[in-house]
Amino acid sequence: MYYCGPNYGVNNLAVGFRCWDASFDTKLTVPYVIGVASLKESGVRSSYSTPGSSLWVSGFGGEYGNNQSYSGFPVVGGNNPALMTTDQSSCSAGYVRTGIDVGTGLNINSFQSGSHPENQNCNYTSTANGTSAATPTISGVIALMLEANNNLTWRDVKHILAATSEQIDSSRQKTY
């Protein structure tokens, strides 16, 4: 599986994969490769996710994890949830530190502030995102498929993914 990060550079499982229109990447034309795009919570393409006809499936990767402002100020861009996952222990390590607003020094993500009743020790982050989050989700789905039937071929896997997926974001204006 290949994924594309928001930095428009190499950020993947294979050196050389680029992050503009996925249709231009010849690696995605290999039949046993599954190109994965990212969706946000509303079921439309994430702002950073690569478009292209060579993508096979989308998984939830969210946006940037902004939520209720801990500082009392509105969050720029509104609510943009990402994925919830475990993080390094403590409020001074891991991704929980990314909720700090550089300008004010205040934590702008209430879940990662240490004051949220379900995350007082900051053992979880709500800002895991991107196609690098969507791809492992799809890999997990494939692992469950293969656990249920280990005789599936790569063609079977791709067929099941296609047959059980639904088209998303079809009415959105194309910007590429």
Stretches with model-predicted labels:
Residues 1-18, 174-176:
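Short, flexible/disordered intra-domain loops and linkers
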Residues 149-176:
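An often Trp-containing, charged/polar helix-loop segment at the C-terminal end
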Residues 144-148:
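Active-site catalytic microenvironments for nucleophilic, acid-base chemistry
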Residues 16-143:
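Extracellular S/T/G-rich loop segment that most often corresponds to the catalytic His/Ser-adjacent loop
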